[in-house]
Amino acid sequence: MTDHIRIEQSDRLITVAFNRPEKRNAITQDMYQAMTDAVNAYAVDDENRALMITADGAGDGAYFTAGNDLQDFAMGPRGENNPPVIQFLHAIKDCPKPLIAAVNGPAIGVGLTLTLHCDLVYAAQSATFSAPFVKLGLVPEAASSLLLPEAIGMAAAMDVFMTGRTLTSEEALRMGLISRMFDDAEFDARARELAMVVANAAPNAMRHAKALVRNRNAEITDRMMAESVHFANQLQSPEFGESVAAMMAKSPAFYP
């Protein structure tokens, strides 16, 4: 377990919150493991009816998550064939019960792509969304190469992936990436209010409704596997090395 993930249970609702503000809530392997354990426990728990992923202390420039902690990942994956990040992505993909994302700050990389596996996505007005994989010499992950075009359209998805552009909450709502947007001042209260609507709904009906809508698990799994091969290859590539070096030096990357 890690102190950088806060897990709370209240009134049939599980809250899983990023709690690493000093690192912009960048996600480490330990954090992925803690989230995986929480999602898997929730999936087989009849008492709790909704799980919400959010961040503590967002607002005033704080982040939902800045994505993966590259320094932590550079030390090498744990369980080479099934690292914690892959376990987490499969856990949220396979979860039969409602998952909610309450995005209360910038959501970068996996911060965006994890929302594609959530059934409801609420965003604060100040939240933003970006998937700058190509800027890092990487490729889309979490089946986002399949799910993002379906959510916002092929042209918009290619714009997000290829330019690394940042979407505002207003744009994300208009495109269909998020379910609802709320003013920052009321966001936490409204997100919890709606999460409780889900938590208090008929549980079997909710499960069946989710299963009917999200009925393409095999296709999504295949896409995640294909992405992971390209992602792993790019992690070992000169392009990734140049991208990280340029980012650390705050200078433009050069790809010969």
Describe each model-derived feature in a short phrase.
Residues 67, 82, 86, 109, ...:
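Glycine-rich phosphate-binding loop at the start of an alpha helix
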Residues 88-94, 102, 108-162, 175, ...:
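CoA-thioester-processing core
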Residues 21, 57, 122-127, 169, ...:
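C-terminal long alpha-helix characteristic of the crotonase
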Residues 11, 70, 85, 145, ...:
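A general structural signal for well-ordered alpha-helical segments in protein cores
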Residues 11-19, 30-77, 92-101, 120, ...:
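A structural preference for short, pocket-lining loop segments at secondary-structure junctions
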Residues 165-171:
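Acidic, divalent-metal-coordinating active-site segment for phosphoryl/phosphodiester hydrolysis
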